């Protein structure tokens, strides 16, 4: 199979828990929804969850908004620090909607599992996956690729499951990132090579692939990175990271292709390093 090759320019420095899908509206469902609505914070309209504190008149406000307030937003009285144990007991029997329900998540779950689910929810806004950039963009999964195409136009995209990722000028000093996109199997993958000083005086390269998609979708693929040349070969195979996870943790834990500058020189030619990238379906 022929490989495509392109130059990567330096950029500078859910799987959700098993869901309880919302069924057709029944008396039980309506009753639960009515109860859940009683826990809505009057400031942010998220839910007030245990531990629940009330003002002297019995009004509730969520723990995120409470530190920002000087008085009760409902009655303007003192906030106080009265804990409402009876309401907390009711909260234990209510199934609360995910905070991303307006974006399409249909899961309802106990308050004890709500925060954990929302951290992994596939409807949570995605951040810009471009490393080394100070881009603060967030949006839906469908909007990620249009954002990259319009705001990060220097990133090259190659078609096919078997390509060459060419990082130029790898001897540049300091922390440097190289980024390229690969499109195959109807999905887009971001290839990232980072050079950073993880330990004092010891620079290393970290290469990884992430899917522009959910964690569940990422599990359907595997990627292989290979340095090849001068009768030497260095290979790494793994499951792509979802852009929901990001790559910072993987790099911190060395859960990617890792090699130091001396190894890079064994495979580089004229300061450029080619990495063979193969994406396959599991």
Curated annotation (Swiss-Prot):
Q: Which InterPro entries match?
A: 7-in-absentia-prot_TRAF-dom, SINA-like_animal, Sina-like_RING, TRAF-like, Znf_RING, Znf_RING/FYVE/PHD, Znf_SIAH
Q: Name one GO biological process term.
A: protein ubiquitination
Phosphoserine: modified positions: 19
Q: Where is the composition biased (Polar residues)?
A: 1-17
UniProt entry tagged with the keyword Secreted: no
Q: Which domain of life is it from?
A: Eukaryota
Q: What is its main location?
A: cytoplasm
Q: Which GO terms describe its cellular component?
A: cytosol; nucleus
Q: What tissue specificity does the UniProt entry give?
A: Widely expressed at low level in embryos and adults. Due to the high similarity between SIAH1A and SIAH1B, it is difficult to distinguish its own tissue specificity. Overexpressed in endothelial cells of adult lung.
Chain positions recorded as Zn(2+) 1 binding sites:
98, 105, 117, 121
Residues covered by region (Disordered): 1-23
For this chain, one GO molecular function annotation is: zinc ion binding
- Family the UniProt entry places it in: Belongs to the SINA (Seven in absentia) family.
Domain remark in the UniProt entry: The RING-type zinc finger domain is essential for ubiquitin ligase activity.
Q: Which protein are we looking at?
A: E3 ubiquitin-protein ligase SIAH1B
Q: What is the phylogenetic placement of the source species in the record?
A: Eukaryota, Metazoa, Chordata, Craniata, Vertebrata
């Amino acid at each position: 199979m022929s490989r495509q090759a392109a130059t990567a320019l330096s950029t500078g420095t859910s799987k959700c828990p098993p869901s309880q899908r919302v069924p057709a509206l029944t008396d039980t469902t309506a009753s639960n929804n009515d109860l859940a609505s009683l826990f809505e914070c009057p400031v942010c309209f998220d839910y007030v969850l245990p531990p629940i504190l009330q003002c002297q008149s019995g009004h509730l406000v969520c723990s995120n908004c409470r530190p920002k307030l000087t008085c009760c937003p409902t009655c303007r009285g003192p906030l106080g620090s009265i804990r409402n144990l009876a309401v907390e007991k009711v909260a234990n029997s209510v199934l609360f909607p995910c905070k991303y329900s307006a974006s399409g998540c249909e899961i309802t779950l106990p308050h004890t599992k709500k925060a954990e689910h929302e951290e992994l929810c596939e409807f949570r806004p995605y951040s810009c996956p471009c490393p080394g950039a100070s881009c603060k963009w967030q949006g839906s999964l469908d909007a990620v690729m249009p954002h990259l195409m319009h705001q990060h136009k220097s990133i090259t995209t190659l078609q096919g499951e078997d390509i060459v990722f060419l990082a130029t000028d790898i001897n540049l000093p300091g922390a440097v990132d190289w980024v390229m996109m690969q499109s195959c199997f109807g999905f887009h993958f971001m290839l990232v090579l980072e050079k950073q000083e993880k330990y004092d005086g010891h620079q290393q390269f970290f290469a990884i692939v992430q899917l522009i998609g959910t964690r569940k979708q990422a599990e359907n693929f595997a990627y292989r990175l290979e340095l090849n040349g001068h009768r030497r070969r260095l290979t790494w195979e793994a499951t792509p990271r979802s852009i929901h996870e990001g790559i910072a943790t993987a790099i911190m834990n060395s859960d990617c292709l890792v090699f130091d500058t001396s190894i890079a020189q064994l495979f580089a030619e004229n300061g450029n390093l080619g990495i063979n990238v193969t994406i396959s379906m599991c």
